[in-house]
């Protein structure tokens, strides 16, 4: 069981995700991104088996309150999973570039090819996924490995050593097949060999 510290970027999908994680047996505590990074770090210190989940939300990753600072502080110290906007923030935190996807995608089902990483264990490729985004990772830094794509667009990334992964799509959507399994796999992977550091500097 994970203790999930959930960063809410003021998004309508937040409680769908929270309900999904709770139905998988995890404890979820929600913190909005208008809190300070210091306050969230202090909350993390109280948790066993912590995993930080970065929610979807409106706007650009740089406009998400404490989230960019929090990512810089926590990467390599706590496992993290980013979804949509959270995924884009992960890409930027590791030095990548997020820009316009060329079209606005709102509620579109796409067939995604994945690389059989552990987060996709037991899942078919291609996999039907739900997309709601206008931005996409256009330059992925060497610290991140692309694990899935749709027509050359990056749909997920991981940093294996830091136990950080990002999904551009929405696993919690009813339009994503096997979404619950994907989220369960992601938590299992995040906790499988967590980063060695346990203290926040």
Curated annotation (Swiss-Prot):
Q: State the InterPro entries in the record.
A: Anth_synth/Amidotransfase, Class_I_gatase-like, GATASE, TrpG/PapA_dom
**In this protein, which residues make up the domain named Glutamine amidotransferase type-1?**
3-196
* Residues that bind L-glutamine: 57-59, 88, 134-135
Q: What does the record give as the reaction this protein catalyses?
A: chorismate + L-glutamine = anthranilate + pyruvate + L-glutamate + H(+)
Active-site feature positions: 84 (nucleophile), 170 (for gatase activity), 172 (for gatase activity)
Which top class of enzyme applies to this chain?
A: lyase
Question: What are the GO MF terms of this UniProt record?
Answer: anthranilate phosphoribosyltransferase activity; anthranilate synthase activity
Q: How does it assemble?
A: Heterotetramer consisting of two non-identical subunits: a beta subunit (TrpG) and a large alpha subunit (TrpE).
Q: What is this protein called?
A: Anthranilate synthase component 2
- What's the source species' lineage? Bacteria, Pseudomonadati, Pseudomonadota, Gammaproteobacteria, Vibrionales
Gene giving rise to this polypeptide = trpG
